[in-house]
Amino acid sequence: MNKVYSVEDFPLDEKTMMLHETLFHNANGYIGVRGTLEEGVPQEYNTMRGTYVNGFYDVIPMKQAESLCNLVEEKETMVNVADVQTMHLSFDGETFSLFSGEITNLIRTLDMEAGTTTRSMQWSSPHGHEVQIQFCRMASFTHKSVFTIACKVTSLNFDGELTVSSKHSGIVANYANPSDPRLAAEGRAYLRPQANILENGVSYLVTHTTKSNLELCTAVAHRFSKPGSSLVTYNADAHCYETSYTCRLHPGETLLIEKYTVIQDSIRSDNCLQDAQKEIESVYGKLDALYQQQREYLSEFWKCANMEIDEDDESNLAIAFNMYQLLQSCGSDGKCGIAAKGLSGEGYEGHYFWDTDIYILPFFVLTNPALARGLLNFRYSTLDAARENAKLVGHQRGALFPWRTIHGKECSGYFPSGTAQYHITGDIAYAAVKYYLATGDTEYLIKEGAEILIETARLWCDVGNWYDGKFMINDVTGPDEYTCIVNNNYYTNACAKYNLNWAVKAANILRKMDAFHALADKLALRDEELDEFQRAADAMYLPYNEKLGINPQDDSFRIRRASCRERV
């Protein structure tokens, strides 16, 4: 099945360029780099030039109309960590740009078997210099901290001096668009310079977040295929290194520029600089080996994930594209999840929602259980924060997972369509059960899964109430965010019923493995509480209209008779 998506001779308008920045981004679940042009765009163009690390964040104020008890007053936001893309090419003083001279054979390609994006074109400069240029990018799946750019310049008729100017900037601003609620964060830099080092031609920039107290190190190294003069300079004001390289290029000759970037952060590393040094040394000059490893990794992925619809190439390519985006977005180390926009940009500020657990995780459960386990490990790592979140909104027991988060705290500033969506707690419990049923991973159930099920079941018992022999859940918001704060949302109640039933089942499974007492001691869990879970599950009210034979969305749902008038 074809797994190459490409566009040719596309318009160079702002809307198309922004779309392509997303479609042709590179990511591996840890780092993500938007598909902006290495050489940049005209100043009047809107662009989102960004590099992101999954789970790396800063903390900023959350503005509220009024200050009320336990309203969210600050939030976590994903940080644009560096600019390692910028690369300018100059031919006898004429700087390459898609917006000057004449461009032909312009193609952008995403190869989902090679794990690379390419952009190639033939450029005729205003003075008639003709060159073939290709950029190839890769975020390595086998070396998660590594991002590479390979630029190949072939002279068609140019005979002169080629100058390359490549930047490594550690202070960059986040993007903001006040008219778009998905991008309403502040457009400012969240990193501060901490150190800069130039060692054996490799530039290292160490930065620090302003409030979350996280550290990041980026390392950049270049390799040129032709002899030439090279100089690396540092601009302290911009916390930026610039590598300048010059060589002679004759017709028929090709220059290959390899740019290696390594990113390390203090969430995963105890010494970011040292680990960046080790990794850049291990991969430098080994681009072909990295390409081969990337192909081998994706070959294994497609063996498990591949599916085809007979005689429908367009749908097959669309399915492959979406599967590949899931893979690019998926955190695998238990320290991060899957952001609403993946690592393609700053939409929703890099927050994790219920999408991960109810829509995406089941795909990995069936195709790559190890990745699914990593996502569940991350949710477990935030369980204590979920317990605290439950207390903040007034519950006596249990765990309430946040509607949107990065590190575990609630980052939704609007309660009715945010925190009130209690179903996310049931979604996470559902994901834990589906993983266990598909894999039979009892170790997960013992170490993490059962604890999540018990704590979330406790929440439902605290949230719900008994009325006329039925267990009901009031004042919550279901997946329909246009109908906020309702009683007995069908989806929420069904999730809670499933959650409560499985809390009891998990406890019984652990009894058979002699693992129950350790969990019971840890959680102060008694058989009477398990009986309470079962009673609530058995009596859970699921709205049903007997006359129409349907399940209303919630107690406030109204079915209106359609009114049709004959038109002449």
Question: Whereabouts are the PLM-identified features?
Answer:
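Long, charged, mostly alpha-helical binding arms that flank functional sites
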Residues: 300-305, 309-321, 326-329, 484-487, ...
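Short, mixed-charge aromatic SLiMs
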Residues: 55-57, 172-180, 345-350, 381-389, ...
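The feature captures the catalytic groove of carbohydrate-active enzymes
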Residues: 344-352, 399-447, 455-542
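Residue-level detector of conserved catalytic or cofactor/ligand-binding positions
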Residues: 558-568
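Secondary-structure transition/capping motifs at alpha-helix termini
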Residues: 125-128, 156-158, 329-333, 366-374, ...
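Substrate-binding groove/exosite segments of carbohydrate-active enzymes
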Residues: 290-437
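Short, well-ordered alpha-helical packing segments
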Residues: 136, 150-152, 165-169, 246, ...
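Acidic/polar, glycine-enriched structural segments that form the non-catalytic walls/loops
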Residues: 1-348
